[in-house]
């Protein structure tokens, strides 16, 4: 028997899945309408066995008429089945963001952009909600196009964030008719469902209007100056073999921007929320940093092993408020069976990240932000994801199986470097009202985040100030980063 999910359901699905898992168990079927069948996994054990160890059979995607077809015309890797087209894009992404390249080529850029983030916060502390998006976007933009994002007001950065929000909203169940399960709904007047086709068409045009001019800039630079060590240059250098259409190239580059900008920015904002709400965690991390580094020394990637508590904080942020709490469904390519449970070909499998991360048997007092729960798991998330051991897995913030985030190595480094430098350079506290009373920051998962596929922070306010003597050091380091590294990018 399958639980019936109403065709109009939309709100807080990951939370509802978690409640149902407590009632029906860690693996339960979910029927959407009269045809669509899902299986929801709220168990690290089952996720590891069905998505990691059987990834050859569980890496397809369900139909996605609205986003996959109308918005991206079948060219977006996120909505592709695990076919040859998807494998090519996956291969190209891993070639850009594999661990070796992150350690040897990309780390200087990440360090420099993180230093620029500190500078931004010194100069414009009240814009703290915008600076993380600039940081993450500039890293991805530089790697893909060789073009930086110097300020959060850069037009491409603003428009990308708006597009990602609209994608998240439009992709949520209930935002458009369930045409993937009831195809006849495609032919009903769209005004009956919020002009969903028009919204999708407009969003598609906005996507192309954002990405295509960036590709044009690279083509112009190659013609006038020459090639550069970017993702797009590498693709164009092999275009005779790859034979990609111009639209495929635009969407493929755009996918990297969409996937890397908002999730990383939201994670850093969640870090701010946690540090304000749990000041003892912030104080402990700062004490460790101060005890390890000499005066005038700012944390860097080379300090990862010396700052285990910061590594724990990164993991706990991703566990406490995962940027994608429900994950995008996988689909089975063939019938499967596991421990007496039968799964039919075409069944969608949802990894309920929120539910796993709030499993009290796995994470005691899961609602509490407690980095020390990872005291025995301070290695990088990719190590535990590749181990295939559910008990040793730290978290599922990057997904599972062959659909795990291809930018996991870059994200792990960018998040650690940013959080370590922020803890070294600043103290974040609650704002005070006109009477001098602290203003609490809302961290309630039901009210502090925008409802949608992605867990985006709603506006909040904090007081962020440089620690004693750090502002001058930050400005000197930022000038050096600009001269030595960032000036090489447009």
Swiss-Prot record:
Knockout or disruption consequences: Abolishes the production of (2R)-annullatin F, (2S,9S)-annullatin D, (2R)-annullatin G and (2S,9S)-annullatin H, and leads to the accumulation of (14S)-annullatin I, 2-hydroxymethyl-3-pentylphenol, (2S)-annullatin B and (2S)-annullatin A.
InterPro entries: Cyt_P450, Cyt_P450_E_grp-I, Cyt_P450_sf, Cytochrome_P450_fung
EC numbers for this chain: 1.-.-.-
Entry binding sites for heme: 405
Disulfide bonds: none
Cofactor (UniProt): heme
Gene Ontology process terms (BP): mycotoxin biosynthetic process
Highest taxon of source: Eukaryota
CDD domains: CYP64-like
Pathway in which the depicted protein is active: Secondary metabolite biosynthesis
Entry-linked Gene3D superfamilies: Cytochrome P450
Reactions catalysed, as given in the entry: 2-hydroxymethyl-3-pentylphenol + reduced [NADPH--hemoprotein reductase] + O2 = (8S)-annullatin E + oxidized [NADPH--hemoprotein reductase] + H2O + H(+)
Keywords: Heme, Iron, Metal-binding, Monooxygenase, Oxidoreductase
One of the record's GO molecular function terms: iron ion binding
Main function: Cytochrome P450 monooxygenase; part of the gene cluster that mediates the biosynthesis of annullatin D, an alkylated aromatic polyketide with a fused dihydrobenzofuran lactone ring system that exhibits potent agonistic activities toward the cannabinoid receptors. Within the pathway, anuE catalyzes the hydroxylation of 2-hydroxymethyl-3-pentylphenol at the side chain to produce (8S)-annullatin E.
Membership in a protein family: Belongs to the cytochrome P450 family.
UniProt-recorded name of the protein: Cytochrome P450 monooxygenase anuE
Organism: Penicillium roqueforti (strain FM164)
Gene name of this polypeptide: anuE
